[in-house]
From Swiss-Prot:
Record keywords, A-Z: Cell cycle, Cell division, Coiled coil, Cytoplasm, Cytoskeleton, DNA damage, Mitosis
One of the record's GO cellular component terms: centrosome
Upper taxonomic lineage: Eukaryota, Metazoa, Chordata, Craniata, Vertebrata
Cellular localisation: Cytoplasm, Cytoskeleton, Microtubule organizing center, Centrosome, Centriole; Cytoplasm, Cytoskeleton, Microtubule organizing center, Centrosome
Keyword Cell division applies: yes
Its job: Required for normal spindle assembly. Plays a key role in mother-centriole-dependent centriole duplication. Plays a role in DNA damage response. Following DNA damage, such as double-strand breaks (DSBs), is removed from centrosomes; this leads to the inactivation of spindle assembly and delay in mitotic progression.
Biased amino acid composition, Basic residues: 572-585
Basic and acidic residues biased stretches: 548-571
Domain of life of the source: Eukaryota
Protein name as annotated: Centrosomal protein of 63 kDa
Length: 711
């Protein structure tokens, strides 16, 4: 027990010495904290330099994107120049066609005069031969009148089809106007979006500067917070070390308490055993006392009997002395005396034996009482030691509670600091998330613009498909007309008489159709100018509305698109040259007198109709409006001679086929390829934006994990 008390005192002295030696350790820890602060400061300076380098790289990327935009503007200027060159070439073609029309009108006037002469000659011959061929002429006239009725019926059907086609062309014109209005709206929207993007770019620059300043301030605050966190961490380490030592002392004290409890239990067991032995000894003492009392009573009784016997002996001796009895009586009395003396000796031996046993029992009782007193003293000392140990335990518990309160207070302060730091980090995350949200909004707007452009491209393709179908129908109708012309040429003599009256009307129609063709041609030219002006503006605005992307990503699609556009412009330049060469080969020759002129009106009306249809079908291409004049020239070339009609018709068809689809195929392919390239570029920009957003998310997660580990 004394060793246990000494160990507890030593533990108390060690804990007090540890508390007094904390100041030197705190000074050493402050030195280490200064070293760590300098190290962290160097790290943060390196990180700020890296961020400044990243900002420089981003500015370089912005400058490269601007350079790419300037290159695109230059390409757009080149395309505009090429379109102007094409427009000039088309105007030259129109002038040539107008000259050919003038020649054609002169030929028509000459044909009219020759037709009048031929008509007079035929009337004169008809009067001479009227008597001879009256019957044959009547049959032939009836047959030709039936054919004429059939042809008129077909012409009515063709007129109905022409009206239907005109209605379709009007609907297509309305659609084109609606598309033009939509394109104007889109251009205005693109201009407004361009302004918005410029304002957003300025705002983003100011925001970047503001964020850089915030970042610097945040870096300073983070450095200070890291210093504070390191100081708090060191303090926490000290407190945890103190707490660990206190816990070790507490465990040691608890172990000693357990050992003392075990010793107390052992002592209590010994005390119970001693109490049992004392109880047994007390019972034995009580029994010995009772036996002693009985022995004393027996001794008193024996002494009384001895005393009585002595008295009797004395009385007998006196009697003997007084009465001098006879010898037998004396012997008998002597024998009784001897027996009494033996009994007395025996009783004296028993008395001595009893006295000896009483002395031994008294000695045993004294020994047991001494042992009992010693055990009582030991129990008292153990109780005192237990009380002292309880007092020590209370003191240790109070010290532990005080240390825990101090530790809890320090932990609360650290938690408050950590909460403040986490709130600041959360605010930074919110700013980063807001920046990411603005980028996502821009990305969404860009996607919406790309979807709208795709829809416009799909509508444009549908319109092109409809135009192709209408062209196929026009070709089919032209083939039908040629077949009808061949059928009409078989009955040339009868039709000359029957259609002589309709020739003047159809010629007037032809003039009106030519005037209408000129008007349509001028309208198509104006529309083409409008579309050529709107398309480069739309492409430029679309290029300006796109996000800037890295340098190595932009050069590949721009080079490919430039190469494709160069090839397409070369094709466009080559094709008008071919068409001009092809049209220069055509020469309008005068018709011989044998050609039936009545074929021309019906053959000229329908090609002019088809020319009007083809002109309206492709409002964005001025060359499509010249198909009617080409077909008129083909009819004139076909009417040179009957033996060569089929061969010349096939040759002119082979030569005139590439003239009509030339502008639609070249410019349509250019527009389609340009739209495809713009779609690829928009997809690539979206992928780059997604990758950049993913990198920002990863960096923010790394920062959050880093500060989470520090906490």
């Amino acid at each position: 027990m004394e060793a246990l008390l000494e160990g507890m005192q030593r533990n108390g002295q060690g804990s007090s010495g540890f508390l007094t030696s904390c100041e030197a350790e705190l000074q050493e820890l402050m030195k280490q904290i200064d070293i760590m602060v300098a190290h962290k400061k160097a790290e943060w300076e390196g990180q700020t330099q890296a961020l400044e380098a990243c900002l420089g790289v981003r500015e370089q990327e912005l400058s490269s994107a601007r350079a790419a935009l300037e290159e695109k503007h230059k390409e757009v200027g080149k395309l505009r120049q090429q379109l102007e060159d094409m427009e000039a070439a088309k105007q030259d073609l129109v002038r040539e066609y107008e000259q050919q029309l003038k020649k054609f009108q002169e030929e028509l006037a000459r044909l009219r005069r020759s037709y009048e002469k031929l008509q007079k000659k035929q009337l004169r011959e008809a009067r001479e031969e009227a008597t001879k061929r009256q019957g044959d002429d009547q049959c032939e006239m009836s047959r030709l009148s039936r054919k004429l009725e059939e042809f008129r019926q077909k012409s009515l059907d063709w007129e109905k089809q022409r009206l239907l086609y005109q209605q379709q062309v009007a609907s297509l014109e309305a659609q084109r106007k609606a598309l033009a209005e939509q394109s104007e709206l889109i251009q205005t929207q693109l201009a407004s979006r361009k302004q918005i993007l410029e304002s957003v770019e300025l705002a983003s620059r100011s925001e970047i500067q503001h964020l850089t300043s915030k970042l610097e301030r945040a870096n300073d605050t983070i450095c200070a917070n890291e210093l504070e966190v390191e100081r708090l961490n060191m303090r926490v380490d000290d407190l945890t070390e103190n707490n660990r030592m206190i816990l070790e002392d507490q465990q040691r004290v608890a172990e000693e308490l357990r050992q003392s409890k075990k010793m107390l239990e052992v002592l209590q067991d010994e005390k119970m055993e001693l109490r049992a032995t004392l109880q047994s000894q007390e019972d034995f003492i009580d029994s010995s006392k009772l036996h002693q009392e009985q022995l004393q009573k027996e001794l008193a009784r024996v002494t009384e009997t001895l005393h009585t016997k002595e008295i009797l002996i004395r009385a007998l001796e006196e009697r003997l002395q007084e009465k001098q009895l006879s010898s037998p009586g004396l012997e008998h009395i002597l024998l009784q005396l001897d027996v009494a003396q033996e009994k007395e000796q025996h009783l004296q031996a028993e008395v001595t034996h009893l006295e000896d046993s009483l002395v031994s029992s008294n000695a045993r009782c004294v020994q047991l009482s001494e042992e009992l007193a010693e055990s009582i003293k030991e129990l008292q000392s153990m109780e005192e030691h237990r009380a002292e140990s309880k007092v020590e335990i209370k003191k240790l518990k109070e010290q532990l509670s005080q240390a825990e309160q101090i530790h809890r207070g320090e932990l609360e302060g650290m938690r408050k600091e950590i909460l403040r730091l986490t709130q600041e980090l959360h605010q930074r995350d919110i700013t980063i998330a807001s920046a990411g949200g603005s980028t996502s909004d821009l990305e969404q707007r860009l996607r919406m613009e790309i979807e709208r452009a795709e829809r416009k491209a799909v509508e444009h393709r549908m319109i092109l498909v409809q135009l192709e179908t209408l062209k196929l129908e026009n070709r089919h109708l032209s083939e039908m007309l040629e077949k009808v012309e061949l059928g009409v040429l078989e009955g040339k003599d009868a039709t000359l008489r029957a259609l002589s009256e309709d020739y003047v009307v159809e010629l007037n129609k032809l003039k009106s159709e030519n005037q209408q063709l000129k008007k349509d041609l001028s309208e198509a030219r104006e529309k083409l100018e409008l579309t050529t002006q709107s398309q480069p503006e739309g492409t430029a605005q679309q290029l300006q509305s796109e996000e800037p992307e890295p340098r190595d990503v932009q050069h590949r699609p721009t080079q490919e698109s430039q190469h494709k556009q160069d090839e397409q412009t070369e094709k466009i330049h080559h094709k008008p040259d071919k068409t001009t060469q092809h049209h220069q080969r055509w020469k309008i020759q005068p018709l011989p007198a044998e050609i039936p002129v009545a074929v021309i009106p019906e053959a000229s009306v329908l090609p002019t109709q088809t020319s009007r249809k083809s002109c309206v079908e492709s409002p964005t291409l001025a060359a499509g409006a010249l198909q009617g004049t080409d077909s008129l020239l083909l009819v004139l070339d076909d009417s040179k001679g009957f033996p060569d009609a089929t061969s010349r018709q096939s040759n002119h068809e082979q030569e005139s086929v590439p003239l009509c689809p030339l502008p639609t195929s070249s410019v349509g392919s250019v527009a389609a390829r340009y739209l495809e390239e713009e779609e690829l570029r928009s997809q690539h920009i979206l992928e780059c934006l997604d990758a950049h957003i993913e990198e920002l998310k990863k960096e923010s997660e790394k920062i959050v994990r880093h500060f989470g580990h520090q906490e």
